[in-house]
């Protein structure tokens, strides 16, 4: 914030030297995360959509891929925080791949401040979907109702206490010992 008293003193000092000085204040609101119509009017033919893909790897770690790129505005950290928060895991267990057009979902790109707003929403939705899938599989493994489970500190826990299962154990079962699950291809079919 500016210090008006200092500015007034500077004005007086300048006036004594025959220099007229003034100051002004401006307020503005910059548009961010607009629709494709907004971009199109300006001649920028880009999409206002972005994609995110999140998967539980065989090690129990999380891999997040997004079409957004990091340009120094902290988008990678923001996306990692969103994923970790939604999944109930530590940020250290989330690996992020941004902007690799061979490996990430299609999207409109960062374009300055839209990265966290639009790309972050895609990460939020993808993380919520993955968590539901994790809880479905955990419910099948633990032979309990999925609504009695949650994920905290990289572990699927029973809300009322009792033994849980780490995401590493869950991932090892899914990737390497699927025969231990129910006979149906989807735990949702076994309810």
Model-derived segments and spans:
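Glycine-rich and small/hydrophobic secondary-structure elements
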Residues: 1-4, 107-141, 169-178
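Accessory "access/gating" subregions that flank catalytic or transport cores
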Residues: 1-54
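Beta-strand segments within the central parallel beta-sheet cores of soluble alpha/beta enzyme folds
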Residues: 9-14, 19-25, 65-67, 91-100, ...
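Short, glycine-/Ser/Thr-/acidic-enriched flexible segments
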Residues: 28-33, 59-61, 68-71, 101, ...
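Short acidic, glycine/serine/threonine-rich loops at helix termini
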Residues: 36-39, 75-77, 105-110, 161
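Alpha-helical support elements that line or immediately flank enzyme active sites
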Residues: 61-91, 117-142
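Polar, glycine-rich mid-to-C-terminal structural blocks
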Residues: 156-158, 165-174
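Conserved small/polar residues in nucleotide/adenosyl-binding loops
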Residues: 182-187
């Amino acid at each position: 914030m500016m210090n008006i008293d200092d500015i007034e003193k500077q004005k007086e000092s300048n006036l004594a030297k025959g220099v007229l000085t003034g100051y002004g204040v401006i307020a503005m609101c910059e548009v961010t995360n607009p629709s494709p119509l907004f971009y199109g009017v300006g001649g920028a033919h880009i999409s206002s959509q972005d994609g995110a893909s999140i998967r539980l790897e065989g090690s129990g770690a999380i891999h997040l891929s997004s079409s957004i790129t990091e340009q120094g505005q902290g988008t990678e950290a923001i996306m990692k925080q969103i994923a970790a928060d939604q999944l109930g895991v530590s940020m250290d267990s989330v690996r992020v791949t941004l902007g690799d057009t061979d490996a990430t979902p299609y999207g409109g790109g960062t374009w300055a401040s839209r990265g966290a707003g639009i790309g972050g929403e895609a990460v939020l939705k993808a993380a919520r979907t993955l968590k539901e899938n994790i809880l479905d599989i955990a419910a099948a493994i633990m032979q309990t109702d999925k609504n009695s489970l949650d994920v905290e500190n990289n572990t699927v826990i029973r809300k009322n206490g009792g033994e849980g299962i780490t995401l590493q154990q869950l991932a090892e079962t899914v990737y390497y010992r699927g025969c231990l699950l129910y006979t149906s291809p989807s735990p949702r079919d076994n309810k």
